[in-house]
Structure formats: structure tokens, C-alpha cells
Amino acid sequence: MNRLDFVDQASLRDDIPAFSPGDTINVHVKVIEGVKERIQVFKGVVIRRQGGGIRETFTVRKESYGVGVERTFPVHSPNIDHIEMVIRGDVRRAKLYYLRELRGKKAKIKEKR
């Protein structure tokens, strides 16, 4: 292993639960406004997970007042307080970009049994 691998290994978080595309999760994000800091919850469906190691990211999509909102987070970011699993989804794809065009019941993902 070279020096960068040691730095990456030290920066990895071990409190992240195992989740995959199709899962519904709550991401508790630290938001800093001036001198105040608060926790904001972003609840949605994971539509992709990409990369590996310290550079790994995931994208969460939700509908807010009829408008689709997507947010991409680094998995090992210090700005993420914690991640909660809500529902395990049963999907057959690794990237769920097709959910962008679907609305209502068609955008619903089956729960894994």
C-alpha cells in the first residue's frame, strides 16, 4: 500500500449502514448557517451508488411539492451526521435513472421481503 491508501483508510467511516439502490433512507445532514449548526433530514430513494473508497458517493431522490429533488452525498463525508434505513427496496438495476420520468404509483418501489 502506498501513502495515499493509508490516508484513505484513516478517513473511512465505519458507522454507515449497508444500503443499495432502491432503498429508502433518511440522511441526517449537518447544515451550517452563520455560527449556528443544525441537522436537516433528507428522506428519499437511493437511485445510484458509485465509486469506491473515500471517493464513494450516492444520490438520493425525493419528490417535494411535485418537483423532483436529487442530492448527491459523499458516503464518508463528515457533514453527514448519520444515515437511517427506512425501507429495503426490491429492484433489479444498479442505476435507477428511469424513476426520473415516472410519477405517482408508477414511481413506487416494491419492498424487499
Swiss-Prot record:
The keyword Ribosomal protein applies. GO terms for cellular component: cytosolic large ribosomal subunit. InterPro entries: Ribosomal_bL19, Ribosomal_bL19_CS, Ribosomal_bL19_sf, Translation_prot_SH3-like_sf. One of its GO terms (molecular function) is structural constituent of ribosome. Keywords: Ribonucleoprotein, Ribosomal protein. PROSITE patterns: RIBOSOMAL_L19. GO terms for biological process: translation. Pfam families: Ribosomal_L19 (PF01245). Belongs to the bacterial ribosomal protein bL19 family. NCBIfam families: rplS_bact. This protein is located at the 30S-50S ribosomal subunit interface and may play a role in the structure and function of the aminoacyl-tRNA binding site. PANTHER family: LARGE RIBOSOMAL SUBUNIT PROTEIN BL19M (PTHR15680:SF9), RIBOSOMAL PROTEIN L19 (PTHR15680). This is Large ribosomal subunit protein bL19. It comes from Mycobacterium leprae (strain TN). The lineage of its organism: Bacteria, Bacillati, Actinomycetota, Actinomycetes, Mycobacteriales.
